[in-house]
Amino acid sequence: MNAKKIQLIAIYLLLAMGVRAQQFTLSGKVSDQDGNAIELATVSCLEQGAMTMANLKGEYSLKLQSKDSVVIRFSMVGYQTKTRVLRRPRGDQKMLVQLAPMEALKEVVVTERRRQTTGTEQLDVKNIRQTPSTTGNAVEELVQQQAGVSTHNELSSQYNVRGGSFDENSVYINNVEVYRPLLIRSGQQEGLSVINSDMVEKIGFSSGGFEAKYGDKMSSALDIHYRRPTRFEGNAQASLLGGGIYVGYASKQKVTTYDQQSVAKFTMSHGLRYKTSRYLLGSLETKGEYDPNFLDYQTYITYQPNERWSLDIIGNISENHYNFQPTDRETSFGTMQNVKTFKVYFDGQERDIFRTLFGTARLTRHFGKNSKVSLLYSAFHTKEQETYDIQGQYWLDDAQTQEQLGVGTYMEHARNYLTANVHSLKLMANHKAGRHDWEAGVTVKWEKIEEKSREYEMRDSSGYSIPHQADRLDMIYSLASENDMRSTRIEGYLQDTYRMETGGEKPWHLTLNYGLRMANWSYNKETIVSPRISLAAIPSWNEDMTFRLAAGLYYQAPFYKELRDTTTRNGQTVVTLNQKIKSQRSIHIVGAFDYRFRMMERPFRFTAEAYYKLMDNLVPYNVQNMKVVYYGENMAKGYAAGLDLKLYGEFVPGTDSWITLSIMSTRQTINGVSVPMPTDQRWGVNLHFTDYFPGTERWKMTLRLAYADGLPFGAPHRGLEYQQFRAPAYKRADIGMSFLAVGKPDATPSLRHPRVWLGIDGLNIFGISNVNSYYWVTDVTNHQYAVPNYLTGRQINGKVIVEF
């Protein structure tokens, strides 16, 4: 037995030595064309399933099995992928590789597959034009499909993030914060957003735990960067819901920057968009003459005379008109055993105008490739008018017994006017020093807002005015506001991104971002301090994994709407501005896990994020359709906790698809009573799926599905404590089919060789009646009935897109 054991051990050792002899070690360095190290570059051998990442010096080491030929792949976001073949490698092999920048490619497509080492996720803008759309705001609709984000109105481009309101989301274009109109109360009134998707190069989105450079909002940050054209380019599109044209130009004169990039000395982009939702609004239950017209023009101009100086200018003009003359409406609602019908005949009309001007200018001085200082000026002006006089005679009946449950007349009146001007001056600096990436900024904002509003609603039920008083005649709702606000806001931040790695043969790659933000507002004489920190770790034992942790103290600095406090006497509500209001406050803790893997020989990524937000100094609010009405006082505290899951990848080769699942609980305590927040969506599922017809890339399909829990609601003009009901779940499916009629899918379009897409979109293809809000009918006994206001039905939209 001992001899046999010795023989077995000897055979095993010989086999092990043979296997070891077939292995080899590949090491070297990955750099750019100037010899600078490319940190975290990926070095892989796909056929052996082996992969590693270069360290912060660009150095790498990888153990592989020796074969007749071994294919090695070097890749990094922003650089061309390079492949090398080794013939019968043995022992230790050295390989130095230089990667060329992507600018040398004919067409650059930036995808979402790069490693996420901060709280900001890079979203893919590829094929955004082929996605079915109801609002014409493709970027916001892309954000609405992300994990933790929800919307319950396909007519609006606004969104809620992890239980926050519409006003808790900051939006930046080229480092300048942008604003939205203040009087918008419904999705029908919304026009085109300030973001022109044809001009977008990069989209960064954070649903929590974002960096100090992003402003004082509690929910999310959307960071948009516009593209500098590299040649003459453009597109034109038309559909039943509107159209637009975009043209970009780059001069032939080039400038070599400090980082050895060749850029055009002068570029300009122009975009003109038109939107009309008349066709879409025709599917609503309220019939009438809809006349919405939304027009938007935008330009982006850059000038860089030399490597030291550059100038960027953005200009935007938006003119939105919404005119509506309702005629009648008939709604059936209730259960199968208890069906009710609500019928209304209307008189009157609504006429709204939202006119917006926005512009920025940025002058940048470059001090080498690692340092620059920028001075930015921006101006925002909006003039808004909302006027309507609408009278309706209504009947509420039991559909089975024909019993009349309510009959009456109501009159709604509004004369709302608002003018707002915001000017800002910002000085920001960027400096890279070794493994540190510093950024700092100081902003001064001058704000001026004037409002004059008068609203009332009168109801008469069975000959009695509601609410019925024996000694006086009261309106069910009456509001008056005449206010003027002038203020100065000073903001500043300092942050650093530090990249490091642990020691050892297989180090951990760490990215630490930390910063401090401060702000002072002259109106309430408040100073806020917001520290923020995040850490991302790529473990040595699996470089396809990333662990992320973020924490910070976040504030929601009040703007005009949060200041509007109300007092009611004898049925008349008067709006005053609360000068003692404080910023809402939230402590964020976010833990995340990313895992990149291959399935069906295609790349995928799974992301899980758990979060908890502890909030105080809250200003409670009601949501009436799309209008957020605040209490005007810091009188609540609350929390939001949840889990967001996302699976992203190529379910079909060469396409991007994803599915998200969000679970959330958010509550607030008002006057000792715990109630769900108005945006308490307990769960939500989103699917974005892209496919090609078998055997061809000319036919393309995009499917969008949304299934989300309903939101809490209650009778209007009452406190949140009485929101004891929950709306039905929001369910919607949109599908878009596109056919490339002219041109080649893989060729860059031009004036001589354009690409022409023909498309058809099925909007709400299952014809699901989603509830937008409720109209409350009150009889003389003060019994109330909630009549649902349904959103759009099934519609077909045709479109043509020409790219050149």
Per-range role (PLM):
Residues 80, 87, 93, 115-169, ...:
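Periplasmic N-terminal accessory/gating domains of Gram-negative outer-membrane beta-barrel systems
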